[in-house]
Amino acid sequence: MSRRVEFDLSTEDHSDRRRTNTFSSSADEDGVPNEVADYLVYFSRMVDEQNVPEILTLYDQAFPDLTERFFRDRMWPDENVVERIIGPGNKLFIILYKELYYRQLYARNTRGPLLVHRYESFMNYQELFSELLSSKDPIPLSLPNVWLWDIIDEFVYQFQAFCLYKANPGKRNADEVEDLINIEENQNAWNIYPVLNILYSLLSKSQIVEQLKALKEKRNPDSVADEFGQSDLYFKLGYFALIGLLRTHVLLGDYHQALKTVQYVDIDPKGIYNTVPTCLVTLHYFVGFSHLMMRNYGEATKMFVNCLLYIQRTKSVQNQQPSKKNFQYDVIGKTWDQLFHLLAICLAIQPQRIDESIASQLSERCGERMMHMANGNIDEFRNAFATGCPKFLSPTTVVYEGVNQSKEPLLRQTQSFLEGIESQMALPVLRGYLKLYTTLPTKKLASFMDVDDEHYDSFIGKLLTYKMIVNELGKEAGPSSADDDEPQTDIDFYVDRDMINIADTKVARHVGEHFIRHIQKLQEVQDVLKRLDIQKP
């Protein structure tokens, strides 16, 4: 349990204290403990004062602590009770409180909340984003990075949950069928179009794409941003909305658009996403998965390994903060195992050097499975994919009665994945033979692999397929990590008429070149700083 947080109300004037006592009496009548009432009053005041460090403590520590102590078996008070406690004129705080309320409702119902609660939660999100997007001037609101990310992440999650819910008749009772029919006819809740519209509107309002592009081109982002783009709140919401869109496009099976969405996001240790652990994991997981589905196995491997290394480094933090583990780190624990199975797929098709600590854990977890995959066992590929992939969705599928169809998108994506794998089943064996030679006649290699004359042309096609994988075609489709010029595979080759020429590309690391590259980067940064027009104080 996290440490208890005391709420200092001593700075209130006499009228504030008198008002608080009045609301505390009201809270007693509503069955709300005085400590919770004090928390809500103080929380509202901190949001109004834009005290971000204190808001972070109240959100990240106090809320889970009070939930554990007072609301393990019941819900937090509804908005009417909260409004009586904190007083009128706090519309934005009530909306933010309801976002927390419905998020807790989703978290504690294993079968999912009732349809009415799903609908009300969407209406609350719509009201929140309407407040932010329809204002003529930037809203004077400051929230911690983790809360801003959680708002976007939960919004996408609830959309995903609703799509799975309406495709599964077993998740609702008879009374909800008529309400679902009405919602679908009017398309006024959790429809794909308003969801995408909200996310893209956040991108447009914040000019986040233009700003990230300017940063990538070493230009001043303020030159392409208006007052909304220069607002810390809108910039961060737009940034997190990019990653929310990445996730949404992957769930819909549009991997090219997913990577295009984050093409200007620099995946480096100083990215904004790095301030929120679950955001970092989400970004790496979905970028890596997109590369996997587009058969860019080298890029996918980089994403998965970097993410696993990050989780490995932060495990001690998770263990020391059990209250956070239930809320912030839940997604990290679930993704940890998924990443290993996806990494196993990549390395079975395209072996390469990875961090030794990750390689050791991968061998323990998936060593036998990888051996079967390398030998062409298609069922092992299917099982690894099913374990590692996200829960795909079909936004237009509605089943009012009959068989559950929520897994149909998964079956389609699995079939698409396996079709690509089946065309590459011979590649691990092919690589094994190529490693033994520096030159090798194509006819001789074909005989090694029991390829007769009738299938010789298709065999040459497999050679070209493997060459494409080695060259990582399509790498430019998304963000990549540093040191891309260092070879990741241990062989390369080319075909000259009927002869295969093979080169061993496993080279020692050149430490000097590493420092030279970073010195050049430092010089580039210094040049950019010199060009910036910064007025001296």
Swiss-Prot record:
Q: Major location, coarse class?
A: cytoplasm
Q: Which GO MF terms are attached to this record?
A: translation initiation factor activity
Q: Which UniProt keywords apply?
A: Cytoplasm, Initiation factor, Protein biosynthesis
Q: Does the keyword Protein biosynthesis apply?
A: yes
Pull one GO CC term from this UniProt entry: eukaryotic 43S preinitiation complex
| Superkingdom of this protein's organism | Eukaryota
Instruction: State where composition is biased (Basic and acidic residues).
Output: 1-19
Asked if the record carries the keyword Cytoplasm, the reply is yes
Cell compartments where the protein resides: Cytoplasm
Q: Which GO terms describe its biological process?
A: formation of cytoplasmic translation initiation complex; translational initiation
Q: Where is this region: Disordered?
A: 1-30
Q: Which Pfam families match?
A: Paf67
Q: Which family does it belong to?
A: Belongs to the eIF-3 subunit L family.
On subunit structure and binding partners, the annotation says:
Component of the eukaryotic translation initiation factor 3 (eIF-3) complex.
The cross-references to HAMAP family, in alphabetical order and at most eight, read: eIF3l
User: Which purpose does this protein serve, as stated in its record?
Assistant: Component of the eukaryotic translation initiation factor 3 (eIF-3) complex, which is involved in protein synthesis of a specialized repertoire of mRNAs and, together with other initiation factors, stimulates binding of mRNA and methionyl-tRNAi to the 40S ribosome. The eIF-3 complex specifically targets and initiates translation of a subset of mRNAs involved in cell proliferation.
What is the name listed in the Swiss-Prot or TrEMBL entry for this protein? Answer: Eukaryotic translation initiation factor 3 subunit L
Species: Caenorhabditis elegans
